[in-house]
């Protein structure tokens, strides 16, 4: 709890209320500092849905970042006399909607990962307790300063079936992204040509297509790729993923990210993730969450397998050529090639998704992911023995 003096905004003392007094179900903060962090947490603990001002307003900062990165590129083109001032201005104006789409996509994914983390929190309470200690040691996270609960307080909440709230998850998510970016800038693979797609995805598609070579030479190339990779990992697999992989495998942070990129691509995770997102407001959010957690489970398992079996020897392109085509072939074998009891399990999961309104093709693909985690082992054994699958 806190009093008016601790809030430090005397002009609004007569207007201020407590978070638990709000009767609305959802809060979105259009401005900064409308809530204190403790008020957000109190509101969330009372059943409300809220994030933080820096999450709700992240689009503003993101838009500025895109603008700066684009202007650096265009100024470089101007100096080389590849672009006139007039064309530069018109080009900037023409990209307004494209930049908006990029910004909103980032904002959407960030809120999505916080929601998914909240969805799974009952089963990951101890994991997040460890994560906060990990970030405290490596990323400068101070629990008291950020109003985050101690291990003991988390245990007390769990007894009451209360867990880390979305405002608290928002803080942890931000610290993990900042930490990852710092680590990845110095990763030995950050300049690998395979990762250029992450660099180009930071720019409007029309600009990336027109100035592909010039973007590849962007002065902030490493920073941009590191930022994109940090966003990919945290947004897709959650803020606790890196900590969990490091603790369970002993691998370095940069190696975990490398393996995660490989796993995402060889299993074509992004393709199915986008199809799930396309079902917004067409199926229940819980149904989408179930499908997304099935994909992230596959991604976690395959990342762990790559870390334990490849020992960082394999490159991005090699992983793609070694596994991707074979995994597609194995995927098509399911459920026919599964043992009878697994076939029954497959049908049950598949029919459950269809009953919840998921299109049959997507329901089948997502259900196949439940049984694909051994695919990399099958392929490895096949290639070692020189036998076809």
Show which residues each predicted segment covers.
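Ligand/cofactor-recognition surfaces for anionic moieties
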Residues: 2-389
């Amino acid at each position: 709890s806190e009093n008016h003096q601790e809030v430090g905004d005397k002009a609004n003392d007569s207007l201020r209320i407590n978070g638990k007094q709000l009767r609305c179900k959802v809060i979105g903060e259009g401005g900064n500092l409308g809530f204190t962090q403790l008020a957000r947490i109190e509101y969330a603990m009372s059943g409300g849905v809220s994030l933080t001002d820096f999450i709700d307003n992240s689009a503003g900062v993101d838009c500025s970042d895109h603008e700066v990165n684009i202007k650096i590129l265009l100024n470089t083109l101007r100096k080389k006399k590849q672009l006139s001032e007039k064309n530069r201005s018109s080009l900037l104006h023409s990209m307004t909607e494209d930049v908006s789409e990029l910004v909103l996509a980032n904002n959407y994914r960030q809120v999505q990962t916080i929601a998914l983390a909240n969805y799974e929190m009952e089963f990951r309470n101890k994991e997040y307790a460890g994560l906060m200690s990990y970030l405290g040691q490596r990323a400068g996270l101070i629990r008291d300063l950020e109003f985050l609960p101690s291990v003991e307080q988390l245990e007390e909440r769990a007894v009451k079936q209360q867990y880390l709230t979305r405002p608290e998850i928002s803080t942890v998510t931000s610290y993990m992204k900042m930490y990852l970016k710092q680590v990845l800038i110095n990763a030995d693979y950050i300049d690998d040509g395979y990762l250029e797609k992450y660099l180009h995805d930071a720019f409007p598609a029309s600009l990336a297509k027109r100035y592909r070579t010039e973007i590849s030479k962007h002065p902030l190339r490493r920073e941009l790729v590191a930022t994109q990779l940090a966003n990919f990992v945290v947004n897709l697999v959650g803020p606790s993923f890196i900590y969990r992989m490091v603790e369970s495998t002993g691998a370095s942070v940069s190696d975990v990210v490398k393996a995660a990129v490989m796993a995402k691509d060889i299993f074509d995770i992004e393709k199915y993730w986008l199809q799930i997102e396309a079902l917004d407001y067409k199926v229940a959010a819980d149904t989408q969450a179930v499908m997304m957690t099935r994909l992230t489970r596959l991604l976690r398992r395959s990342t762990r397998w790559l870390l334990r079996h490849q020992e960082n020897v394999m490159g991005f392109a090699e992983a793609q050529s070694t596994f991707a085509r074979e995994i597609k072939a194995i995927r098509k074998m399911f459920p026919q090639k599964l043992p009878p009891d697994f076939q029954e399990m497959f049908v049950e999961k598949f029919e459950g998704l269809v009953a919840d309104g998921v299109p049959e093709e997507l329901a089948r693909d997502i259900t196949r992911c439940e049984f694909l985690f051994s695919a990399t082992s099958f392929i490895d054994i096949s290639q070692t023995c020189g036998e076809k699958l």
